[in-house]
Amino acid sequence: MNLMDIAKIFSLLQPEKEEEDTGTGEKQALNQAVYDNDSCTLDHLLHQERYKRFINSRSGWGIPGTPLRLAASYGHLNCVKVLLEHGADVDSLDVKAQTPLFTAVSHGHLECVRMLLEAGACPSGSIYNNCSPVLTASRDGAFAILQELLGHGAEANVKAKLPVWASNIASCSGPLYLAAVYGHLDCFRLLLLYGADPDYNCTDQGLLSRVPQPRTLLEICLHHNCEPEYIQLLIDFGANIYLPSLPVDPTSQDDKGIKLLLQARATPRSLLSQTRLVIRRSLCRANQSQATDQLDIPPVLISYLKHQ
């Protein structure tokens, strides 16, 4: 992030001069209708030009935002619907550069998330915010929300947008890392199914090259004493089992995760497992990670490809 990036952020978040001095009553009326979850009143107001011109204006206490951001944060689905029908900017930013989708994800409002995505919201959130909807859903264990985001094209290898000097922090901030550390096995598996890299949760070699000693997911899972299922999933999805260095303490050999890793190192991967890896990687490279159901193969093999 450079000075030009910072200047761009502030320019986006600065309110228009005329907005600062006008429309206070209209903005308050729109926000009050959203607060009250009164979609009928909101619809009536937005049919009037004096109110509609402020549909994308940021206002309110705390974190000033648009009416759509407010509706998304409260989970007021009907208000979200009315605002979108009247042309509200689906990716409008609040003063923290967060989109309505990010706000809906943060508050766990699945139906609002689904409606915003169907209206064209960017599943990755704003490029001007350090976090992303996928990172938030992975951290919170919001499986259904994460599934919606990934199904609408969100990147499973998304990274927090940190400056170069903090890249050593970013290397361990991917959604897989968060799902593992916070113990959300279902989200962890889902991310892998959508093509998350099982080694570093990062496919940006430029970023990895700037990290002096990047830690693999296997290392992180072992360090945090994650359940053996996490280790097994990483092995099954093709993680490099020779990357992490194992502890020299003999007592650590009793750890179930380390036992799994040692067993994988000592046992050649089966031809069936290798075939599954090749097929899944080919589908991911073609951005078709969920196309297994379309393959002309027996159902039992489709289930195997989906790790079921």
Swiss-Prot record:
<feature type="repeat" description="ANK 3">
    <location>
        <begin position="129"/>
        <end position="158"/>
    </location>
</feature>
<comment type="similarity">
    <text>Belongs to the ankyrin SOCS box (ASB) family.</text>
</comment>
<comment type="subunit">
    <text>Interacts with CUL5 and RNF7.</text>
</comment>
<dbReference type="InterPro" id="IPR001496">
    <property type="entry name" value="SOCS_box"/>
</dbReference>
<dbReference type="Pfam" id="PF07525">
    <property type="entry name" value="SOCS_box"/>
</dbReference>
<dbReference type="GO" id="GO:0061630">
    <property type="term" value="F:ubiquitin protein ligase activity"/>
</dbReference>
<keyword id="KW-0833">Ubl conjugation pathway</keyword>
<feature type="repeat" description="ANK 1">
    <location>
        <begin position="63"/>
        <end position="92"/>
    </location>
</feature>
<dbReference type="GO" id="GO:0000151">
    <property type="term" value="C:ubiquitin ligase complex"/>
</dbReference>
<feature type="domain" description="SOCS box">
    <location>
        <begin position="268"/>
        <end position="308"/>
    </location>
</feature>
<keyword id="KW-0040">ANK repeat</keyword>
<comment type="pathway">
    <text>Protein modification; protein ubiquitination.</text>
</comment>
<keyword id="KW-0677">Repeat</keyword>
<dbReference type="Pfam" id="PF00023">
    <property type="entry name" value="Ank"/>
</dbReference>
<dbReference type="GO" id="GO:0016567">
    <property type="term" value="P:protein ubiquitination"/>
</dbReference>
<feature type="repeat" description="ANK 5">
    <location>
        <begin position="213"/>
        <end position="243"/>
    </location>
</feature>
<dbReference type="InterPro" id="IPR036770">
    <property type="entry name" value="Ankyrin_rpt-contain_sf"/>
</dbReference>
<protein>
    <recommendedName>
        <fullName>Ankyrin repeat and SOCS box protein 12</fullName>
    </recommendedName>
</protein>
<feature type="repeat" description="ANK 4">
    <location>
        <begin position="171"/>
        <end position="200"/>
    </location>
</feature>
<dbReference type="InterPro" id="IPR002110">
    <property type="entry name" value="Ankyrin_rpt"/>
</dbReference>
<dbReference type="Pfam" id="PF12796">
    <property type="entry name" value="Ank_2"/>
</dbReference>
<feature type="repeat" description="ANK 2">
    <location>
        <begin position="96"/>
        <end position="125"/>
    </location>
</feature>
<comment type="function">
    <text>Probable substrate-recognition component of a SCF-like ECS (Elongin-Cullin-SOCS-box protein) E3 ubiquitin-protein ligase complex which mediates the ubiquitination and subsequent proteasomal degradation of target proteins.</text>
</comment>
